[in-house]
Structures are given as structure tokens and as C-alpha cells.
């Protein structure tokens, strides 16, 4: 029996990668609550300058991640996914350590860019599990895996705020580096992968990758869906606290209310993703995707008409439950329409589209709210998601007709 034929305990790998995604999600979000404060501590003064630099250090990570993801995806298809997980966890740990030592804003900006270049733990974890799990359990497995990053992202800001209050800003970066190093150790000792390295000559080029896809047009539509999901999520982020303040009026605990309303979609996604993923394995992920997109539209529109923060919280909870199905459904359809040989690149391309959405979403939300007010953001976002639902339905219908 060759090494590549030795059975893999994919359930153990799923558990360990879930922990890795949880730690990575927590590590990234640990520093988010005080990022503008750290920018100020590095010598940036003035309201407009602080806003500009805070936006730059936030977005540059996603921009460089979008650029680097296809390269790392190709390397994963050549060398294996485990080594990419190790490279990502250790690289991010070192960069986080250096961030805590930054002396000026330019050093910090460069390190944030480097963080984007060296990232990629979660897409590589998705690719690893997608190539190991039985096809009929892909939806459940990828849905479960997605809850790891969501859980970490939910707990990270809370933990980061508490740590910053008790120990100061710089020590949080050192703690974050330690968390990422633990992720590296877990991956090194407990994840197993049977992978036969592929020479550069044997690697499929981009045209061959496209030719090997069962339905290239559908795969492109799935990439666009990923982008729009992130645009829809990100467009609301810049205005959420201000919108909650407008709804709540003069209350003393506006930060708490805003934080709770910001986090409820994540809690709902945490509960819904594995269950809807399992349902998708039974009835088809394409049905889950279209229904979840339509429900998202129907929930976004009334958000522009709410009168109290609690009405907004309820709608965002329901939206989170629907959104919890979206990315796992996209990833499952990518698994169905590609081969293990190119899984690393397909998931990395998907990550690039996700990163572009992470950058453009907040810009779109800020621009719309500046011109037309907070409530218009929800209506425009609903329109974008509706377009995506129609586009995705049309792509999936063409695929079904082609099969028939």
C-alpha cells in the first residue's frame, strides 16, 4: 500500500482544523477593537488622518491576501495542504509578534500587508477537509468547519477588549502571536495528510485548470456569490453603530447594544451552519444557496424600516441563520465541480474574491450612507443580493439543463 492509499482519519482532522480555524479567527479579531487606538498610539493625530490610516491598516491585509491567495493555492496543490497550514500559522504568529514591537505607522502598515501575504489558514483548512471528507458529507463537514472561524471571530473582540483594558495594547499582539503558535503546534502534531508532491512540470496551468472544471461558468458564478456575500456583510459594518444610536436615542450603554447587535448574526450562523449543511447534503446545496439568498433579501429590506434596536437585532439574528448556509453551500458546490488535484487553487481563488468583498463592502456602505443615509444601505444591499440570487439561479439552471 502506497502512502497515498493509507486511510486518513478525516474526523480527527476536522476536529483539529476546527480548533485551528477557531484560534485563527480569534487571533485576527483580538486586535480589531483597538486597531484605531493603536494607530493613534503610533503617532497619528487628527480626526481625518486617524480615519484614513485606520482604514488603510484594516483594508491592506485583505488586499494583499487577495493577491497572494492564488499563489499559495497553487503551492498547496503541489506540496500539500498541511505544509500550507503550518506556513500560515507560523508566519502570522511571527508577524503578530513584530506588530507588538512596531514603532511607527509605516512599520505597522507594512506588517499588516505582510499578514495578508502570509495568511490563508482557513481556505487551506477548507481545501484539506474538502479533499478528505466523503462527498456525501461535504456540506455538513464544511458547515461545521465554518463555525470554527465564526466562533473565534465572535469571542476575539470581547477577549481583545478585556486584555487591552488590563494589560495595554502591545501585549495583546504578543498574546495573539502565542495563540497562533498554539495553532501551529496543533497542526504539526495532530493533522495527517497523505499527499504525493507534484513537480512544477506536472502542474496544470490556469487554462488547464479551467478546462478541468465540470462547469467553469458555474464556478465563476460561485466566486461572484462569495464576493457579494462579503460585500453584503461588510456594507453594513461601517454604519451599524451609528444606525443603532439613531434608533436607540440617548442611552448610556450604546456600545453594549451595538456590540450585541453586531454579534447576533454570528451566533445564529454558528447554530445554523452545520444543520443547513447537513440538509444540503440531503436535498442539494444549490437549493440551500438560492433559498438562503432569497431569505437574505427579504430580511435586509425591513431592516431599513425598523424603529427600535431590538427589531434590528431580531432581523439580524434571522439573517445570520440564513447567511450561515451561504459560504458552506458555495464551498460544497465548488467541491462537486472540481477535482482534488486543483482544490487548493479553487479554494484560494474563492478566498481572493472573499477578500475583495471584504474591502469593497465597507467602502460601498460608507459611500451610500454618506449620500443617502443609513437606511438606504440596507435597500441597496438587498438589491445586490437579489441580483446575486437571480444570477446564481440562472447559472445553476443552465448546469441542470446541460446535464439533462
Curated annotation (Swiss-Prot):
Single Gene Ontology MF annotation: transmembrane transporter activity
Membrane topology reported for the UniProt record: Multi-pass membrane protein
Keyword Cell membrane annotated: yes
Segments crossing the lipid bilayer: 19-39, 56-76, 90-110, 113-133, 144-164, 171-191, 222-242, 254-274, 288-308, 317-337, 376-396
Name of one Pfam family that matches: MFS_1
Gene Ontology terms: cellular component: plasma membrane
Subcellular location: Cell inner membrane
Entry keywords, A to Z: Cell inner membrane, Cell membrane, Membrane, Transmembrane, Transmembrane helix, Transport
Gene3D superfamilies: MFS general substrate transporter like domains
Classification via InterPro entries: MFS (IPR011701), MFS_dom (IPR020846), MFS_MdtG_subfamily (IPR050497), MFS_sugar_transport-like (IPR005828), MFS_trans_sf (IPR036259), Mutidrug-R_MdtG (IPR023692), Tet-R_TetA/multi-R_MdtG-like (IPR001958)
Family: Belongs to the major facilitator superfamily. DHA1 family. MdtG (TC 2.A.1.2.20) subfamily.
PANTHER family: MULTIDRUG RESISTANCE PROTEIN MDTG (PTHR43414:SF6)
Name recorded for this polypeptide: Multidrug resistance protein MdtG
Organism for this UniProt entry: Salmonella paratyphi B (strain ATCC BAA-1250 / SPB7)
Amino acid at each position: 500500500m502506497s502512502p497515498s492509499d493509507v486511510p486518513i482519519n478525516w474526523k480527527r482532522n476536522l476536529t483539529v482544523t476546527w480548533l485551528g480555524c477557531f484560534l485563527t479567527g480569534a487571533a485576527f479579531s483580538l486586535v480589531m477593537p483597538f486597531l484605531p487606538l493603536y494607530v493613534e498610539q503610533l503617532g497619528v493625530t487628527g480626526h481625518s488622518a486617524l480615519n484614513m490610516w485606520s482604514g488603510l491598516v484594516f483594508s491592506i491585509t485583505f488586499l494583499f491576501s487577495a493577491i497572494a491567495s492564488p499563489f499559495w493555492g497553487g503551492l498547496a496543490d503541489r506540496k500539500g495542504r498541511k505544509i500550507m497550514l503550518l506556513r500560515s500559522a507560523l508566519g502570522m504568529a511571527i508577524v503578530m509578534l513584530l506588530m507588538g514591537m512596531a514603532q511607527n505607522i509605516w512599520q505597522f502598515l507594512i506588517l499588516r500587508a505582510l499578514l495578508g501575504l502570509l495568511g490563508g489558514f482557513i481556505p487551506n483548512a477548507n481545501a484539506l477537509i474538502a479533499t478528505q471528507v466523503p462527498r456525501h458529507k461535504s456540506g455538513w463537514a464544511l458547515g461545521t468547519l465554518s463555525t470554527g472561524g465564526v466562533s473565534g471571530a465572535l469571542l476575539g473582540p470581547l477577549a481583545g477588549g478585556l486584555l487591552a483594558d488590563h494589560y495595554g495594547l502591545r501585549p495583546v499582539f504578543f498574546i495573539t502571536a502565542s495563540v497562533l503558535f498554539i495553532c501551529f503546534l496543533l497542526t504539526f502534531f495532530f493533522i495527517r495528510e497523505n499527499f504525493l508532491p507534484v513537480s512544477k512540470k506536472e502542474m496544470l496551468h490556469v487554462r488547464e485548470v479551467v478546462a478541468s472544471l465540470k462547469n467553469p461558468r458555474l464556478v465563476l458564478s460561485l466566486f461572484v456569490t462569495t464576493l457579494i456575500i462579503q460585500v453584503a456583510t461588510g456594507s453594513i459594518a461601517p454604519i451599524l453603530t451609528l444606525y443603532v444610536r439613531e434608533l436607540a436615542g440617548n442611552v448610556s450603554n450604546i456600545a453594549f447594544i451595538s456590540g450585541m447587535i453586531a454579534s447576533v448574526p454570528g451566533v445564529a450562523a454558528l447554530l445554523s451552519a452545520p444543520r443547513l449543511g447537513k440538509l444540503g447534503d440531503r436535498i442539494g446545496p444549490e437549493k440551500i444557496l438560492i433559498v438562503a439568498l432569497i431569505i437574505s433579501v427579504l430580511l435586509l429590506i425591513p431592516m431599513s424600516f425598523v424603529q427600535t434596536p431590538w427589531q434590528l437585532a431580531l432581523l439580524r439574528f434571522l439573517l445570520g441563520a440564513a447567511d450561515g448556509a451561504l459560504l458552506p453551500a458555495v464551498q460544497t458546490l465548488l467541491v462537486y465541480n472540481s477535482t482534488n488535484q486543483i482544490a487548493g487553487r479553487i479554494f484560494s481563488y474563492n478566498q481572493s474574491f472573499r477578500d475583495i468583498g471584504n474591502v469593497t463592502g465597507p467602502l460601498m456602505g460608507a459611500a451610500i450612507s454618506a449620500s443617502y443615509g443609513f437606511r438606504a444601505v440596507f435597500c441597496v444591499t438587498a438589491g445586490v443580493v437579489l441580483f446575486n440570487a437571480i444570477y446564481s439561479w440562472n447559472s445553476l439552471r443552465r448546469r441542470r439543463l446541460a446535464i439533462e
